[in-house]
UniProtKB/Swiss-Prot annotation:
GO terms for cellular component: endoplasmic reticulum membrane; nuclear envelope; nuclear membrane; nuclear pore; nucleoplasm. Belongs to the POM121 family. Contains F-X-F-G repeats. Essential component of the nuclear pore complex (NPC). The repeat-containing domain may be involved in anchoring components of the pore complex to the pore membrane. When overexpressed in cells induces the formation of cytoplasmic annulate lamellae (AL). Residues 1-34 are annotated as: Cisternal side. Keywords: Endoplasmic reticulum, Membrane, mRNA transport, Nuclear pore complex, Nucleus, Phosphoprotein, Protein transport, Repeat, Translocation, Transmembrane, Transmembrane helix, Transport. It comes from Homo sapiens. This is Nuclear envelope pore membrane protein POM 121. GO terms for biological process: mRNA transport; nucleocytoplasmic transport; protein import into nucleus; RNA export from nucleus.
Length: 1249
């Protein structure tokens, strides 16, 4: 009765109101009827609709009633004769009004009495259920028509009972005590009206009430029914992708319902078909298929006939039209996928269809199964491909089947073939394959493809761990393609071929099984996959070849190293390419180190199984690349290799650009030998290379898609000029500052200001960051170094100057010499300035040659992730990458942040540079002065001071607004980039420093050398102040640590979200999403959430060396492993010591030395070392973190979401996308780069199509 009570409450208002309107009813029958209808509807709603709906209706009714009352009194007054009677009610109505004020006391009784007054007996009879009264009122009142009038007198008697004695008198009597007459008169008209109305109302009430009730009932049920129906089709479509359809089909009434809709939907046939294929895919998944085959076989035979005929005919026609195209695609895909499956169970799959197949080539295939299959494939293949690529979950097996199944589901299977055969056959295939995922053929083409691919790749890795796995995998793929292509052609041409067509048919048979309710599983995935797999393999091969050729040509021109580079490009991931991995072992870069790295990169790219191949993991991570192999080189930086580094870089540039999809550019830098400071290795390399760098400079040039700019090299001689290349500027923005000459590179931005400013020629190094893969960037190696890192950009620094390129934008701006963006003082060059890119990293170098800057510069970039920074010697840092990008950071000290982060370098000298870049969102870089000055630059520590920026706020003082950032070009964040001289970094990016999201920091230069830069930086971030808001010491919460950048801000600057140091959530140093970490020495910074320093926040950070954080955590101080806690989702691993936790937090900081590990948070933690992947990543920690490699490298990054794997070696952290270690992929657990590449390839393919 609560509804009844509610109704009664409503009744108080409405019924008196109704009565009023009833009075009106006579005056105005329409309004009264409307009111009555409304009441009846309300009653129905009370019964039919949930309380919420009832309340809504009541409110509507009440509003209408009040509106009516406001009008009614006027009309009602004329009815004086009834007013007396109504006066009875008036008190009641007045009561009702009063009761409304104090409904608790009178509401229900008054409502009833008022209702009684209005309806009298009917109500008294119906009083029990007020809602019932409302509903029944209309019917009873209407039906009893005459009785109601009688009832009215009775009602009067009843009224008299309460106040009948003088009907008129009681009204006055009762009104004065109960309510003032003024109220009563209006109420009376309602009551009075109600009496009159009832006689007239009965019919209206009956009609409206009856009508509304059926309407409500009908409409509601109809709507509900409709909704489910809609949902079913929708689910089916979804299922088509997911393979859930079978249930939907069941809901939709299995085959018939589903098929019939398909038949009716022939227009939408692709959709329908798609639905079936996904189910098959699932059915392909071993168990479901088997079960389905048995369960669905009988139903499948039923539904297929009608569908098969009509749908088959239409499908056949369409398919015949599309066959030529699809068959070609299918030939490849089927050959690859079905090849193995066929071999597994070629005969069984065809048994049902073979006769049809025997009829002829695909055309003869026309028998319902074949042609329809293709037709469906042709229709839905594109969609399927898209869906499949999106939902990698589809089993590759299904991919092969999917193309065949859809038509078969409609036609051949449904019409002529028993579902059991198809299912069992599919089954067999799967069984032999070992499960959709494991089947080798399927692995390529379908989701299972990933696991299968991993298996194959693992095999490849094992077979040729030293040789580039990519090449092997590709070769195997090529062989498969060659083998499969003919078979596919045969199959598509004549499905008589038991292998391909049979399997498809089997797939179709799955459709019959689908009738069993799982028919839906296979189709879409298969369709999508068949094309996708083919595209992946063929496109990859073609693109890789093309890249290789381009790279080879360029690299040949540039140098021997090119050969290696091309391979690097080879892997072109969609997002990233490792610039580094060269296909050929040729060392031209540091041969030994490079080769292994390159190989490992290839392996990473190719074989998902990084874990199996440590090299691959190491290589995979770009950072890993260089660092692991040649720690000294800082390969991370660019892999710089000594080798003719000059050449290498150029090749690398050349090669890279091609590689990167987006393209990165490397700017060549020239560092004169001066580099010195760079880590010795760097120095040596740089020294050797400077010339080389200059040479490369021309090479780089190429710009990339996105605009990367290419840089032009300046004359090698003039180091400053060299800077050239600014790298890509960030897409969004970045202007780079070009500062002095910066020749603008043709590339979009110029960044490079050529670092002219930098005083040292050395610094000039400019590296351009490359843009590197879309998502990931590579840093260009600065001058010398070849950009090795896979993803990372490395920057190279040759000298400090290097800039790194940002990922996205690469901008890397920093050139060393200020160049890129900022420069800081010449020596400092902090260049850093990350570009926005998504992240850029910048790096600045400090004057110190070491600067790590170089290293740092190295790269950062990741798209999302930054590359690592390299440290000079430290290469290790590199490591982590975040997927989203973290830059890795830097060598030693530095760590990278995840999201972006920059990292700083640790070395004192080095200190400065780090640049982390945001990579993902922002980058930063930090620079530092040499050691100190930087103060803080990064350091995290640093303190201090003062303020911390506001989180979002900008950081640093620099006045510049962020965007405008004076210099800063970065789009999002500015980088600081100032001319070297410029003091102010202008950083202030909006978010704070530079980066928008993250900022970069300005680098500080070495203090001496560039006080200005330092100064700049300082403001930018330096200000030491960086505290994180959340907490970190240094940084500001959102990061503003100076250093850190928000999302990615570089360390120095605060990041928007995360300060550099701090992380968004807190990483200490690291930047928001990614935190970087920070730096070395001091180390600690706190993290927001706490990670120690480093932790990056979010998404992933890398760790600095040490810890990682999950989300972003990382940590990292070098020395200590700081733990950093990770925050977020994923933890990165921490470096060695530290552990970080994912969410966790921990802590904080530790000083350098301390390890402090952080505690883990919750989300997932990974342990440091451990690699367990959360999602499966390899080592990856939960979300993917990966662990770092041991060694300093540890820092390796982790990825937040994705898993990454552990880095392969050493440090290397991870590569952003492809990187080995970790890859980002949000969803993915750790994926091996190989898997990632496949996904990317699919995506690309889908896009292309």
């Amino acid at each position: 009765m609560s509804p009844a009570a509610a109704a009664a409450g409503a009744g108080e208002r409405r019924r008196p109101i109704a009565s009023v309107r009833d009075g009106r009813g006579r005056g105005c029958g329409g309004p009264a009827r409307a009111v009555l209808l409304g009441l009846s509807l309300v009653g129905l709603l009370l019964y039919l609709v949930p309380a919420a709906a009832a309340l809504a209706w009541l409110t509507v009714g009440a509003t209408a009633a009040w509106w009516g009352l406001s009008r009614e009194p006027r009309g009602s007054r004329p009815l004086s004769s009834f007013v007396r009677k109504a006066r009875h009610r008036r008190p009641l109505s007045s009561f009702v009004r009063k009761a409304r004020h104090r409904r608790t006391l009178f509401a229900s009784p008054l409502a009833k009495s008022t209702a009684n007054g209005n309806l009298l007996e009917p109500r008294t009879l119906l009083e029990g259920p007020d809602p019932a009264e409302l509903l029944l009122m209309g019917s009873y009142l209407g039906k009893p028509g005459p009785p109601q009038p009688a009832a009215a007198p009775e009602g009067q008697d009843l009224r008299d009972r309460p106040g009948r004695r003088p009907p008129a008198r009681p009204a006055p009597r009762s009104p004065p005590p109960r309510s003032p007459p003024p109220r009563s008169p209006p109420p009376s008209p309602p009551t009075h009206r109600a009496h009159h109305v009832y006689p007239s109302l009965p019919t209206p009430l009956l009609r409206p009430s009856r009508r509304p009730s059926p309407r409500d009932c009908g409409t509601l049920p109809n709507r509900f029914v409709i909704t489910p129906r809609r949902r079913y089709p929708i689910h089916q479509a979804q299922y088509s992708c997911l393979g859930v359809l079978p249930t939907v089909c069941w809901n939709g009434y299995h085959k018939k319902a589903v098929l019939s809709p398909r038949n009716s939907r022939m227009v939408c046939s692709p959709v329908t078909v798609r639905i079936a294929p996904p189910d098959r895919r699932f059915s392909r998944s071993a168990i479901p298929e088997q079960i389905i085959s048995s369960t669905l076989s009988s139903p499948s035979s039923n539904a297929p006939d009608p569908c098969a005929k009509e749908t088959v005919l239409s499908a056949l026609k369409e398919k015949e039209k599309k066959r030529t195209v699809e068959e070609e695609d299918q030939i490849f895909l089927d050959g690859q996928e079905n090849k193995r499956r066929r071999h597994d169970s070629s005969g069984s799959g065809h048994s049902a269809f073979e006769p049809l197949v025997a009829n002829g080539v695909p055309a003869s295939f026309v028998p319902k199964p074949g042609s329809l299959k293709r037709g469906l494939n042709s229709q839905s293949s594109d969609d399927h491909l898209n869906k499949r690529s999106r939902s990698s979950s589809m089993s590759s097996l299904t991919g092969a089947y999917a193309s065949g199944i859809p038509s078969s589901s409609r036609n051949a299977i449904t019409s002529s073939y028993s579902s059991t055969r198809g299912i069992s056959q599919l089954w067999k295939r799967n069984g032999p394959s070992s499960s959709p995922f494991s089947s080798p053929a399927s692995s390529r083409s379908q989701t299972p493809e990933r696991p299968a691919k991993k298996i194959r790749e693992e095999e490849l890795c094992h077979h040729s761990s030293s040789s580039t796995p990519l090449a092997a995998d590709r070769e195997s793929q090529g062989e498969k393609a060659a083998d499969t292509t003919p078979r596919k052609k045969q199959n598509s041409n004549s499905q008589s071929t038991p292998g391909s067509s049979g399997q498809r048919k089997r797939k179709v048979q799955l459709l019959p099984s689908r009738r069993g309710e799982q028919l839906t599983l296979p189709p879409p995935p298969q369709l999508g996959y068949s094309i996708t797999a083919e595209d992946l393999d063929l496109e990859k091969k073609a693109s890789l070849q093309w890249f290789n050729q381009a790279l080879e040509d360029k690299s040949d021109a540039a140098s021997n190293s090119v050969t290696e580079t091309p391979p690097i490009t080879q892997p072109s991931f969609t997002f990233t390419l490792p610039a580094a991995a060269p296909a050929s072992p040729p060392t031209s870069l540091l041969a030994p180190s490079t080769n292994p790295l390159l190989e490992s990169l290839k392996k990473m790219q190719t074989p998902p199984s990084l874990p199996p191949c440590p090299e691959s993991a190491g290589a995979a991570t770009t950072e890993a690349l260089s660092p692991p192999k040649t720690p000294s080189l800082l390969p991370p930086l660019g892999l710089s290799q000594s080798g003719p580094p000059g050449l290498l870089p150029s090749p690398s540039f050349d090669s890279k650009p091609p590689t990167t999809l987006l393209g990165l550019i490397p700017a060549p830098s020239m560092v004169p030998a001066t580099d010195t400071k760079a880590p010795p290795t760097l120095q040596a390399e740089t020294a050797t290379k400077p010339q080389a760098t200059s040479a490369p400079s021309p090479a780089p040039k190429q710009s990339f898609l996105f605009g990367t700019q290419n840089t032009s090299p300046s004359s090698p001689a003039a180091p400053a000029a060299s800077s050239a290349p600014p790298m890509f500027k960030p897409i969004f923005t970045a202007p780079p500052k070009s500062e002095k000459e910066g020749p603008t590179p043709p590339g979009p931005s110029v960044t490079a200001t050529a670092p002219s400013s930098s005083s040292l020629p050395t610094t000039t190094s400019t590296t351009a960051p490359t843009f590197q893969p879309v998502f990931s960037s590579m840093g260009p190696p600065a001058s010398v170094p070849l950009p090795a890192p896979f993803f990372k950009q490395t920057t190279t620094p040759a000298t400090a100057p290097t800039t790194t390129a940002p990922l996205f934008t690469g901008l890397a701006s920093a050139t060393s010499a200020v160049a890129p963006i900022t420069s800081a003082s010449p020596s400092t060059d902090s260049a850093s300035k990350p570009a926005f890119g998504f992240g850029i990293n910048s790096v600045s170098s400090s004057s110190v040659s070491t600067t790590t800057s170089t290293a740092t510069a190295a790269s950062q970039p990741f798209l999302f992730g930054a590359p690592q920074a390299s440290a000079a010697s430290f290469t290790p840092a590199m490591g982590s990458i975040f997927q989203f990008g973290k830059p890795p950071a830097l060598p030693t000290t530095t760590t990278v942040t995840t999201f972006s982060q920059s990292l700083h370098t640790a070395v004192p000298t080095a200190t400065s540079s780090s640049a982390a870049d945001f990579s993902g969102f922002g980058s930063t870089l930090a620079t530092s002065a040499p050691a100190t000055s930087s103060q803080p630059t990064l350091t995290f520590s640093n303190t201090s001071t003062p303020t911390f920026n506001i989180p979002f706020g900008s950081s640093a003082k620099s006045p510049l607004p962020s965007y405008p950032g004076a210099n800063p070009q970065p789009a999002f964040g500015a980088a600081e980039g100032q001319p070297p001289g410029a003091a102010k970094p202008a950083l202030a990016p909006s978010f704070g420093s530079s980066f928008t999201f993250g900022n970069s920091a300005a680098p500080a230069a070495a203090p001496t050398p560039a006080p200005p830069s330092m100064i700049k930086v300082v403001p930018a971030y330096v200000p030491t102040p960086i505290h994180p808001i959340f907490g970190g010491a240094t940084h500001s919460a959102f990061g503003l640590k100076a250093t850190a950048s928000a999302f990615g801000a570089p360390a120095s600057s605060q990041p928007a979200f995360g300060g550099s140091t701090a992380v968004f959530f807190g990483a200490a140093t690291s930047s928001g999403f990614g935190a970087t970490t920070q730096t070395a020495s001091s180390g600690s910074s706190s993290s927001v959430f706490g990670s120690t320093t480093p932790s990056p926040f979010t998404f992933g950070g890398s760790a600095a060396p040490a810890g990682s954080g999950s989300f972003g955590i990382n940590v990292a101080t070098p020395g200590s492993s700081t733990t950093t806690g990770a925050f977020s989702f994923g933890a990165g691993q921490s470096g060695s010591t530290a552990t970080s936790t994912p969410f966790a937090g921990g802590l904080g900081q530790n000083a350098l030395g301390t390890t402090g590990q952080s505690t883990p948070f919750a989300f997932n933690v990974s342990s440091t070392t451990e690699s367990k992947p959360v999602f499966g990543g390899t080592a990856t920690p939960t979300f993917g973190l990966n662990t770092p490699a041991p060694g300093v490298g540890t820092s390796g990054s982790s990825l937040s979401f994705g898993a990454s794997s552990a880095p392969a070696q050493g440090f290397v952290g991870v590569a952003p996308f492809g990187s080995a270690a970790l890859s980002f992929s949000i969803g993915a657990g750790s994926k091996t780069p190989g898997a990632r590449q496949r996904l990317q390839a699919r995506r690309q393919h889908t896009r292309k199509k």
